[in-house]
From Swiss-Prot:
Protein name: tRNA modification GTPase MnmE
EC top class, as a word: hydrolase
Chief localization: cytoplasm
Gene3D superfamilies: P-loop containing nucleotide triphosphate hydrolases, Probable tRNA modification gtpase trme, domain 1, tRNA modification GTPase MnmE domain 2
Gene: mnmE
Residues bound to (6S)-5-formyl-5,6,7,8-tetrahydrofolate: 22, 83, 122, 457
Function summary: Exhibits a very high intrinsic GTPase hydrolysis rate. Involved in the addition of a carboxymethylaminomethyl (cmnm) group at the wobble position (U34) of certain tRNAs, forming tRNA-cmnm(5)s(2)U34.
Length: 457
């Protein structure tokens, strides 16, 4: 398969030390040669070499650059690739790109370089999606999972499962088409059930990692809730180590929702500092309270903050009711002051949920809180090198569908259905697993997936 030659800026827009303009395609080296001036033509250059020179337009030098030449097939796209390293100015970089376009290159679509790597067989679809996961990773663990997926760990597992299914289907077909062959082992219902159970167990094992994988990939929407002036904004600022929220002794000073991402011991949290939830006549504060209630309803995880220096109120107890059904940690703040809170009542309300004491004004208790969050979601350490990790929402959905098809095979066999009937669901499971790696996928889905990438990737 041969495509045209594409070009795009691969680095983020704006001022910086360098910017990279990438070309890929059959004419990549020739097009770059038309605008690059040095002692040696790029067309004569060996693969994976770097060359110093200038970019000229109508005889005028417009950039001083370093150019990398990489010849097919030992490139990301398996095509000839040229990368021009220029100074990171907005005007100069765009001028170089426009010059390439005028000399025969076409502007790349979002994700087109990665799409070509997939279409040319350099990577499969799950590996291509892992590229975006790596770019978006917010923690070292998330990065580790993405890198392992890019290396093909998930792909190999899925292909092994598909091969198990294919072997069973092939034997069923031989039995149906050539029943007179005595030397071909008959695929009995018992044998097919054993094959199905083997694949089904592996799919279930993959899905068991999905919840933690989804946390690593997307982060947890974390609502910090509590009555006004219990220390919610102080907690936010301590976790992110920045003064993002207003901290005063005046109740109700947080009128809006403040969001910030933070990495807590490998757990990516999207922290939402909500306005204090209470009954109020202040119109502006009332809007903030309503937004807080919505954030609470949508949250994956809750930090419920109480003031240890005050007695438990009806509003506090209502927060426990609102948090029911969520994972949450109770934060008993202001331990530097006299304890007036009924701790036994708090334990009763919290049930099995962790309780951590803090004095945010004295920087006390934060480590214990971080450890409680890590333990709550990651029982022990996640092994980012685990080859069976699944974190992509599309993959999880396909695995669930494949599991349903495999369950249908098991049910059919147990009901005594003929092997040639239950093989329909077996084939469906094979197809669904193939959609994860891109071995069976529609063009419309490919366009949708790769359009999520940035230009130049």
């Amino acid at each position: 398969m041969e495509f045209d030659t594409i070009a795009a800026i691969s680095t983020p827009p704006g001022e910086g030390a360098i910017a990279i303009i990438r070309l890929s395609g059959p004419e990549a080296i020739q097009i770059a040669d038309r605008i690059f001036y040095a002692k040696k033509n790029l067309s004569e250059a060996e693969s994976h070499t770097i060359h110093y020179g200038h970019i000229k337009e109508d005889g005028e030098v417009i950039e001083e650059v370093m150019v990398t030449v990489m010849r097919a097939p030992r490139t990301f796209t398996r095509e000839d690739v040229v990368e021009i390293n220029a100074h990171g100015g907005i005007v100069s970089v765009n001028r170089v790109l426009q010059l390439l376009l005028r000399n025969g290159a076409n502007l790349a679509e979002p994700g087109e370089f990665t799409k070509r790597a997939f279409l040319n067989g350099r990577i499969d679809l799950s590996q291509a999606e892992a590229v975006m996961d790596l770019i978006r990773a917010k923690t070292d663990r998330a990065m580790g999972v993405a890198i392992r997926q890019m290396d093909g760990n998930l792909s190999r597992l899925i292909r092994n499962l598909r091969q198990e299914i294919l072997d069973a289907l092939a034997q069923v077909e031989v039995n149906i088409d050539y029943p007179e062959y005595d030397d071909v082992e008959e695929m009995t219902q018992r044998m097919l059930l054993e094959k199905t159970e083997l694949v089904r167990a592996s799919v279930e094992q993959l899905l068991q990692t999905a919840s933690q994988g989804k946390i690593l990939r997307e982060g947890l929407a974390t609502a910090i809730i509590g009555r006004p002036n219990v220390g919610k904004s102080s907690l936010l600022n301590q976790l992110i180590q920045e003064e993002k929220a207003i901290v005063t002794d005046i109740a109700g000073t947080t009128r809006d929702i403040i969001e910030e991402y933070v990495n807590v011991r490998g757990v990516p949290l999207r922290l939402i500092d909500t306005a204090g939830i209470r009954e109020t006549e202040d119109i502006v504060e009332k809007i903030g309270v309503e937004r807080s209630r919505k954030a609470l309803a949508d949250a994956d995880f809750i930090l419920l903050v109480l003031n240890q220096n005050e007695e438990l109120t009806v509003e506090d107890e209502a927060l426990f009711e609102a948090a029911a059904g969520h994972n949450y940690v109770v934060v008993l703040n202001k331990t530097d002051l006299e304890t007036k809170l009924d701790i036994n009542k708090v334990r009763e309300l919290a049930g099995e949920n962790p309780i951590v004491s803090t004095s945010l004004v004295n920087d006390e208790g934060l480590e214990a809180l971080e450890e409680a969050i890590k333990t709550l979601f990651f029982a022990g350490d996640i092994d980012a090198g685990d080859a069976t990790y699944v974190s992509n929402v599309r993959h999880i959905a396909l695995l669930h569908q494949a599991l349903e098809a495999l369950n249908a095979v098991t049910t059919g066999i147990q009901l005594g259905m003929p092997v040639d009937i239950v093989q329909i669901d077996m084939t469906r499971a094979w197809d669904l697993l193939g959609e994860i790696t891109g071995d069976s996928v529609q063009d419309e889905l490919l366009d949708q997936l790769f359009n999520q990438f940035c230009l130049g990737k």
